[in-house]
A protein has these predicted regions:
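N-terminal glycine-/serine-/threonine-rich beta1-alpha1-beta2 phosphate-ribose binding loop
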Residues: 1-96
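Rossmann-fold NAD(P)-binding glycine/threonine-rich loop
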Residues: 86-96, 105-143
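A short hydrophobic/small-residue beta-strand
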Residues: 99-101, 381
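Rossmann-like NAD(P)H-binding beta-loop-alpha module
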Residues: 120-201, 208
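Substrate-binding/catalytic subdomain of NAD(P)-dependent oxidoreductase enzymes
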Residues: 179-276, 281-283, 302
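Low-complexity, glycine/alanine/valine/leucine- and proline-rich hydrophobic stretches
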Residues: 264-289, 303-304, 375-392
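Glycine-rich phosphate/pyrophosphate-binding beta-alpha loops
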Residues: 294, 298-304
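A conserved regulatory-domain signal marking ACT and ACT-like small-molecule sensing domains
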Residues: 309, 314, 318-438
Length: 438
């Protein structure tokens, strides 16, 4: 049988890894796919780099649009990143009847609805396992492995850079700024780390997972996003003393009022497996009504872990290449005409527990004033610690953990607490999730 002909867009870190894995494991891959998979041509703006990497094993070009129009190409693999040019290339490939494999989370989060509709009309597939959590097969699990379940919630560590920073802050007692500089030196953080440390990258991935889990359109603009740049080593230490660890989580949950979509630092009980995921690793908890909680763990980035997911998609597309489109797994797991328009819950309506840290004057009556404000908002306290003042200091830290309460209530309480003359500066608020069976 004639090999499937692949056009590869981009031969950078992931593109190079994909080319390497596909050639190194060619025999195993073809046995699994049922036919050979051949990278016929590689397009890259740096033609010299492309030629140096592929040698005589594939054609090279710097004209990506010519590649996606070639009649001899069956599958286009998009690994150039960005949203503008990548979107145009993918839509052109689809228009020309090509199946597409992509690792482009930002593109799908922003334009996935348009891309999937175009693919549906042309009867081609868009595969995107590598777009979320690198080598962790979470898309496959959500689309197929958990298809018998009504997904209740997902909570994941889905950005390795942020997880590395938080792990180092906890283990070494370092400040955020110091660990960020170290992460950049080690190559774990970009020169401009904004997407990673402010939760944008995680929000892209959460958008995709929520769409598959609940059969809703991609809605990146409705994800509440808060990063880790304001976290202090003191908060990480206090959380540890209380039996918790702080992780940047992407959380989506089905509720009676709508779907939660949120990315933010979160206290998790130290006893949970996901709380012990360290360094640049990723982990995703998925709760299904039948299966209960399931955990997916692995490398969320890197050349070959991500290439593993890209090549897995190539094998899937190759297997289904000649299948009737009606027999294929839908892009977002649900049949296109059965997608739901469930409302996205506003952040102020989300119910969770909270960690609060206040810097206050060490005077009688201060605690009574604060607890009175919390009681006025029907917020009950689960645990509280008052730290001893340092030598010569007049201020102390008070740390509180609340029971479940609505975000709007905690916001109103914080506003009133910060107006008290005995309270110094802003109240630190970090959300808390138990992540048990419920």
């Amino acid at each position: 049988m004639k090999p499937i002909q692949v056009g590869l867009l981009g031969i950078g870190t992931v593109g190079g890894g994909t080319f390497s894995v596909l050639h190194r494991n060619q025999e195993e891959i073809s046995r699994r796919a049922g036919r050979g998979i051949l990278i016929k041509v590689v397009a890259d703006k740096d033609l010299a780099r492309a030629r140096a990497m592929v040698g005589d094993r594939a054609e090279t070009t710097d004209d990506a649009f010519a590649l996606v129009r070639r009649p001899d190409i069956d599958i286009v693999v998009e690994l150039i990143g960005g949203t503008r040019i990548a979107k145009d290339l993918i839509l052109t490939a689809i228009e020309n009847g090509k199946h597409v494999v992509t690792a482009n989370k930002a593109l799908l989060a922003h334009h996935g609805n348009e891309i999937f509709l175009a693919a549906q009309k042309k009867g081609v597939m868009v595969a995107f396992e590598a777009a979320v959590a690198g080598g962790v097969p979470i898309i496959k699990a959500l689309r197929e492995g958990l298809t018998a379940n009504r997904i209740e919630w997902i909570a994941g560590i889905i950005n390795g850079t942020s997880n590395f920073i938080l792990s180092e802050m906890r283990e070494k007692g370092s400040s955020f700024a110091d660990v960020l500089a170290r992460a950049q030196k080690l190559g774990y953080a970009e020169t401009d780390p904004t997407f990673d440390i402010e939760g944008v990258d995680a929000a892209h991935k959460l958008t995709i997972m929520a769409a598959i889990a609940f059969g809703i359109p991609m809605q990146f603009d409705k994800v509440y996003t808060e990063g880790i740049s304001r976290l202090t080593k003191e908060d990480i230490r206090y959380a540890e003393e209380l039996g918790y660890r702080i992780k940047l989580l992407g959380i989506t949950r089905r509720t009676a009022k709508g779907i939660e979509l949120r990315v933010h630092p979160t206290l998790i009980p130290s006893k949970r497996l996901i709380a012990n995921v360290e360094g640049v690793m990723n982990a995703i908890l998925v709760k299904g009504d039948a299966v209960g909680p399931t955990l997916y763990y692995g490398a969320g980035a890197g050349a070959e872990p991500t290439a593993s997911a890209v090549v897995a998609d190539l094998v899937d597309v190759t297997r289904m290449h000649t299948a009737d489109p009606e027999q294929r797994v839908p892009h977002l797991a649900f049949q296109p005409d059965r997608m739901s328009d469930l409302p996205i819950l506003a952040m102020e309506d989300v119910e969770t527990a909270y960690y609060l840290r206040l810097r206050v004057l060490d005077r009688p009556g201060v605690l009574a004033d604060i607890t009175r404000i919390l009681a006025d908002q029907s917020i009950s306290i689960d645990a509280m610690v008052q730290k001893e003042p340092g030598e010569g200091e007049e201020q102390v830290d008070i740390i509180m953990l609340t029971h479940l309460t609505v975000e709007k209530s905690i916001n109103d309480a914080i506003t009133r607490i910060e107006s008290l003359p005995v309270v110094s500066g802003k109240v630190t608020r970090i959300r808390l999730e138990e992540l048990g069976r419920n």
